[in-house]
A protein has these predicted regions:
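Hydrophobic packing positions in regular secondary-structure scaffolds
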Residues: 1-125
């Protein structure tokens, strides 16, 4: 799917059509499209249309700055859904690469048990 088609579907609010098209795409391609979208609002709309599992996979393929923007803009529940789909080591990597002002939101979104594991992994050399 071309970036222009995505932009057109968002602008015309054809979200059902867009959601169906995204279903057939792989996560790496969706990540590239999100990186190419200039409009932050469009990125959020497209990301929110993804099923939970695909959103997690797409998130793991994104550039660090795009992930940071999404973390800031997603609700706590949405962020929890995305983080639940990541492998624990990916969550640790995410925490290590994010600025210190973003980390508390990530930690708040993961379960208490997962937070303990993350803390242990962060201590591991």
């Amino acid at each position: 799917m071309e970036i222009e088609e995505i932009k057109r579907l968002v602008e015309t609010k054809k979200f059902t059509v867009l959601k169906n098209k995204l279903q057939g795409m792989n996560s790496a391609d969706i990540s590239e499209i999100l990186d190419e979208l200039e409009d932050k609002e469009s990125v959020i709309i497209v990301f929110r249309l993804l099923p939970k599992e695909k959103a997690g996979m797409t998130f793991s393929h994104m550039e660090s700055d795009m992930r940071q923007k999404l973390i800031q803009d997603l609700t706590d529940a949405e962020l929890k859904g995305v983080l639940d789909e990541l492998f624990m080591d990916d969550t640790v990597d995410l925490i290590e690469e994010m600025p210190s002002n973003i980390v508390p939101k990530i930690l708040k979104a993961i379960s208490k048990e997962d937070r303990k594991i993350v803390n242990e992994l962060l201590k591991y050399p």
